[in-house]
Amino acid sequence: MSSEVKSFSKFRGYFFPIYRSEFSKFIPLFFLAFFVGVNYALLKTTKDSLVLVGSRAGAEVIPFLKVWGIVPGAVIVTMIYGWMSRRYSRGTVFISLVGGFLGFFALFATVIYPIGDALHLNKLAAKLQSILPPGGRGFVVMVQYWSYSLYYVMSELWSSIVLSTLFWGVANHITSVREAGRFYALINTGLNLSSVFAGEVSLWLGRNPVIAFPMAVDPWHEVLLNITLLIVLAGGVILYLYQKLDRLMDETSMLKEGLAAEMSVAQLKKEKKRSKAKAKSLFALLLRSRYLLGIAVVVLSYNLVIHLFEVVWKDQVCRIYASRVEFNSYMSRITTLTGIVSALTGIFAAGQTIRRWGWTIGALVPPLTMLITGALFFGAIYAVKGDAMIFGGILGISPLVLTAWLGGVQNVFSRAIKFTYFDQTKEMAFIPLEDDEKNYGKAAIDGVISRVGKSGGSLVYQGLLIIFSSVAASLNAITIVLLLALGSWIFVIAWLGREYTAKTEALFRVNVSEEDVLQEEREASSLVDAESREEPVTTL
């Protein structure tokens, strides 16, 4: 037990604040996060390569998939998860869902992709194309290549179901509140490192497939089979690590380790949810609080802006890479860079910036970064549209390659600041609120507003595509929407910063007053104890 009370050295306390007795819990949890993140990153690059390259719609299919594919898919899988959770044990639910995902990816690579031409709805697509306007070709491609669309949806659901729901459900259940403050920062670092690992492995497999599969129908199929084999192997490790953690989640083992008296993160959430039914409406509370509305605007703005930028960037990349193998290699390198920048920013910049210059400066980093990198990206696109060869000629590359490269830089930094500055300042913004506002407001914002932002961006694109027929033709309208969203984001953060400062100062004054009262009570109690210990003086 001495190790538990012994303080860490300054170096270890900063980089690895884990006690030796916690290794049996932390190490499998860390590697579980790592391998779940590896599969997430591999699937992210693979789904884009499969769906975007080779079709006549390119990146225009993304907005339609987000609304008509991912949203219904998320609802269906969430219903399945809820149904299973009510009838089966936690372990059965985890293994069944993860096994279901792995089984689908293996089935797709070995059976569905090779016979895809026979499965695709070419006649229906031709009929839809004759009915819909030119801007609806993204919807037509989504329906025509339904098997690719299904792979895209399942890959996206790995993030929301396996990573967000299953993994963090395990982490919250097994981790105490005291441990979470030390565990979760390192786990997030593990997720960033998994992006680096997955990006480099995917890049290498694209250039040098490890196994030459005789059943491969084309070069991309061979790469897909190798990546799928890695996904299945990582899935096997995930299931093995979960079984180790499942034994630790048993209440008797937690008692033996002295953790029974301490509330876990999952138990804490359960305690908070007991009062949740008393709230008439999450959104009524949200609408009554200008402060919570400000946080909602910030979350909505980020999800809207990142989606608008991403579709334009991927549209540029699709024009350069006609091969799925080449496109996958490019996206793999972007994944690697995102992981590196996220890890370095999280370790060396985000926390120090907020501690030194305050919440407002930290919260302004995401919109300003996206504004600056986005201006460079869109400026290059407008230069290409105007046949300007200035920067491309100086750098010795074509203007189209330059725009794609700048779009990649914009995406890397946008994703990196999301995992560091944005998430941290968003969570900090809830701290000075009352418990009801904090719990109910956070549930509404994280559970609904973030999804509204993503779907809202897709709906904006669908409307623009119907009107202007293509992403390139919609660029002026997209620029206006982006400027309005970024301007609103920055304005709201400036206002929120003043409110946050006022609320935290008021909270600090309350805490100081309470501490003063407690100190006075302790001093009075000490004085009474001292007087009671004095022996009476008697005289003869």
Curated annotation (Swiss-Prot):
Keywords: ATP-binding, Cell membrane, Membrane, Nucleotide-binding, Transmembrane, Transmembrane helix, Transport
Transmembrane segments: 23-43, 61-81, 93-113, 150-170, 185-205, 222-242, 292-312, 334-354, 361-381, 389-409, 455-475, 477-497
Alphabetical list of InterPro entries matching this protein: ADP_ATP_car_bac_type
A single Gene Ontology CC term: plasma membrane
Membrane topology qualifier: Multi-pass membrane protein
Protein's UniProt keywords contain Acetylation: no
Compartments (UniProt record): Cell membrane
Presence of the UniProt keyword ATP-binding in the record: yes
GO molecular function, one term: ATP:ADP antiporter activity
Family: Belongs to the ADP/ATP translocase tlc family.
NCBIfam families recorded: AAA
UniProt protein name: ADP,ATP carrier protein 2
Species this protein is from: Chlamydia trachomatis serovar D (strain ATCC VR-885 / DSM 19411 / UW-3/Cx)
